[in-house]
Amino acid sequence: MRGMGNMNNMMKQMQKMQKDMAKAQEELKELSVEGTAGGGMVKVVVSGHKEVLDVIIAEDVVDPDDVDMLQDLVLAAINDAMKQADQLVNDKMGRFTQGMNLPGF
């Protein structure tokens, strides 16, 4: 019956880990990062759940004759913000997946 104690401990550890992961996921929802492009002329704010929360465009960069440049800056700012959001998720959730070799984590 000695193995049952180990099994109970393992189950308790798994339950604690699930609870901790849920808490970390909830915390990610409250965190945000800001990506920028064009020296800060375009800013994009993204949540820890990778949801775009805000796009800020400086008036100076809005040129009706050069919409392509504005589109490129918005795209670059979004990509920068998403990269930072990925890092935020890795920092917050990485401890749960260390050594597990799970794809996508």
Curated annotation (Swiss-Prot):
User: What coarse category fits the chief subcellular location reported for this protein?
Assistant: cytoplasm
User: What Gene3D superfamilies does this protein's entry cite?
Assistant: Nucleoid-associated protein YbaB-like domain (3.30.1310.10)
**Which key words are in the record?**
Cytoplasm, DNA-binding
- Location within or outside the cell: Cytoplasm, Nucleoid
The annotated regions of Low complexity compositional bias extend over 1-16
Keyword ATP-binding carried by entry: no
Q: Which GO terms describe its cellular component?
A: bacterial nucleoid; cytosol
- Which domain of life, per UniProt? Bacteria
Spans annotated as Disordered: 1-26
Recall the GO molecular function terms of this protein's record.
DNA binding
Q: Compositional bias (Basic and acidic residues) spans?
A: 17-26
Q: Which HAMAP family match?
A: DNA_YbaB_EbfC
Q: So what family is this one in?
A: Belongs to the YbaB/EbfC family.
Its biological purpose: Binds to DNA and alters its conformation. May be involved in regulation of gene expression, nucleoid organization and DNA protection.
Q: How does it assemble?
A: Homodimer.
Q: What is this protein called?
A: Nucleoid-associated protein EAT1b_1710
Q: Which organism is it from?
A: Exiguobacterium sp. (strain ATCC BAA-1283 / AT1b)
